Amino acid sequence: ARRVKLLHNFRNLVIENEMEIASRLTQEHGKVADDARGEVARGIENIEFACGFADSLKGTYSEHASTGVDVYTVRQPLGVCAGITPFNFPAMVPLWMIPNAVACGNTFVLKPSERDPSAPRFLIELIQEAGFPPGVVNLVNGDKTAVDRLLEHPDIAAVSFVGSTPIAKYVYSTGTSTGKRIQAL
């Protein structure tokens, strides 16, 4: 219930600051105003989606699945997840990743593109303002060195990447070689 409340707080802050986020996208990235507002609107929809499933992530119990056998399903967070996001959707892609990871009980490290980091940084400020405890959502800026550190870090269980195919292949091969779950689009 606490995660849902925090996600709702975050959603409300993103809605209140929608024009500010869109303005940052327009100024730093160069998106036209309508596209920037659309990017933020899609991100808000994803926060709402995460709010809807956060409370339903519970295990199950099935009695007598077989003779003398009961079945338990336990849903557990992965732990620390990371997201490496592209320059062309600096607000929407983090808003795909962060709410879903947090709704599932994970902590999250965001590594935005170094080309346009102000909108992602502002989103992290809104997360803090929403009341998320320190360390639940974190921001790491940098280039390939930062990416490599995330892919190599033993405490990071999963990495999601959105970007070009050559870099996706690199993220996938490097991350899986260290035992991480990788989503590379």
Segments and roles (model prediction):
Residues 80, 129-185:
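Conserved NAD(P)+-binding/catalytic subdomain of aldehyde/semialdehyde dehydrogenases
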Residues 1-57, 68:
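Glycine-rich loop-to-alpha-helix module at the N-terminal edge of alpha/beta enzyme cores
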Residues 60-134:
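Conserved small-residue-rich beta-alpha loop and adjacent elements
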Residues 16, 20, 31, 42, ...:
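Short alpha-helical
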